UniProtKB/Swiss-Prot annotation:
This is Photosystem I assembly protein Ycf3. Pfam families: TPR_1. It comes from Nandina domestica. It is a peripheral membrane protein. The keyword Thylakoid applies. Coiled coil: none annotated. Essential for the assembly of the photosystem I (PSI) complex. May act as a chaperone-like factor to guide the assembly of the PSI subunits. Gene3D superfamilies: Tetratricopeptide repeat domain. GO terms for cellular component: chloroplast thylakoid membrane. It is found in: Plastid, Chloroplast thylakoid membrane. GO terms for biological process: photosynthesis. PROSITE patterns: TPR, TPR_REGION.
Amino acid sequence: MPRSRINGNFIDKTFSIVANILLRIIPTTSGEKEAFTYYRDGMSAQSEGNYAEALQNYYEATRLEIDPYDRSYILYNIGLIHTSNGEHTKALEYYFRALERNPFLPQAFNNMAVICHYRGEQAIQQGDSEIAESWFDQAAEYWKQAIALTPGNYIEAHNWLKITRRFE
C-alpha cells in the first residue's frame, strides 16, 4: 500500500490529497508521476523518522526524476537523512550534488556550514586548532553563501561571522 494511503498525519494527508490532484491535472509523463510518488512517500517516511524507507523512496525517485531542479530537492533530503544519522561526509556529498543542480538552495549551504562548524568544534576538542580554523573558515564561506541567497535569514550564523571577524 502506498505510504500516502496509510499516513495518519493531517498535514501529510492534506499534502497527499493535493499532490494526487495535481498529478492528475498537470500534464506530466508517467515517469515524472512515478518519481513524484516516490518523492512524496520518501518525505512522508522521513517525517516519521523512518529513514531507511525514506532513503529507498528517494533513491528510486532520483532514478526516475529527470528535472535537475526537482532532483536537487530529492538529493537535499537524502543529505538531511545522512546528517541526522551522523554520516556527515555522505551528507556533504548529497548537499554538493543538490547544489550542482540548483545553486539557489540556501538551506543546503547552511547545513554544509553546520557540519563544517561541528567538525571545527571536534578538532578543538582534539587539540588541533589549525584544522579547527580550516573547518571554521569553510563554514564561514558556506554561511556567507546562504546569507547572500536569503538576506535576513540565518541570523545566528550572521552573528557568528561578525563575532569571529569572518564577515566581509
